[in-house]
Amino acid sequence: MKTATYFEQPSPQLTTLYHPDGKTPYPYWNILLRPAGSINASARDMAAYVQFYLNRGAVGGVQVAPAASIDRMETPTRTWEAQEGLKAGYGLSNYTSIHEGFVYHGHNGGVDGGITDMSYLPEYGVGYFYSVNSANGGAFGKIGDAIRAYITRSLTKPPVPAAGELPANAADYAGFYVPAAPRNELTHFLSSGLGLTRVRFDGGKLLLTSLGQFDQPFIPVSGAQFRYVPKKGPAEPIATAMLLRPNAEGRFTYLGGAMVRIPTGLAILQIALTAWFVLAFVAIVVYAPFWTIGGLIKRRRRPAERAMRLWPLIAVLSLVAFVALFVVSGNDAIQRLGNLTVYSIGLFATTVLFALASVASAIALLMARREEIRRFVWWFSILVTASLLIGTAYLAYWGVIGIRTWS
């Protein structure tokens, strides 16, 4: 590989990276953390890199690296599931992925405005590399689908293992799970809630239900390993899920990531509180226009109720602003949130305002004279204020209140 280097290169040798619009350029980003990659290389050199894997470490007939080293790179060993026998997963900068019934090895990557994928089928002797210089994930996915369809057009899919028996202790694993170690700590507060997953067993299958998925089937292969059977498309030919042995940290499953079981009561409470918060959020927004318009009519003004209705609305609007800032920062999140900008300061300010407004809602409720408040408004205020305080406590627990992304 004649051009590959960790170091920043003169601009004439670098391609320009663009936003999803294909017109607005990104500044070049030379990542300093080598475990993350940051290798600059030409497409020709990357093609040679794919060939290096396919030839099991040989280049031009010369064995540069032992074939055993390539095998080791492709083999996960350190994760719990790997130590219990699961072959699919992350090795040494090389992981397995399954597309249309074929098992690929390789790695992808991305920076602002640049996405790439290097994958190969060692058993068939074919592979590919491609990259795009635009943050257009949709186009990137379509290109990858087209390439994989082309290189596998005359290949026979690997056989699918016969269905095995459920482990004798499978019922012990039924229940609710949450991600044990999310990749992104910044959004841990979301994955802890939105990642709630239910595992159950029926008809000799493991059935997985999570947000956006219902009873996704996994077929037992051998031992505690399972292979996924998509409702559309070919079945996966290798096991990619596993029931892990319980340890001092709890009972875990591997379902594309380590999942830890939580008590059913806690899961139900989590679902109920989330539903309560969402309903309160919607109710505050829906109710606001009515009391706002009513406040313009003198005979309908109710000063005693004003603070009880205003503070929850401020809390909700601050949360909306928080989400909007995240969305608007999207394509430039590192630049906008990683520095002291109006976006990062906005996240800090809106979360603090949400907490203060939620507390102010409770104070307004406590200080209100019961006899001056309509019964409906009183109970409405209690329900929405309680939900806002619960939301504040949850976000504070995960460090979201007063978040400083620039530090």
Where do the language-model regions lie?
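Flexible, active-site-proximal loop/turn residues at the rims of small-molecule/cofactor binding pockets
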Residues: 55, 136, 183
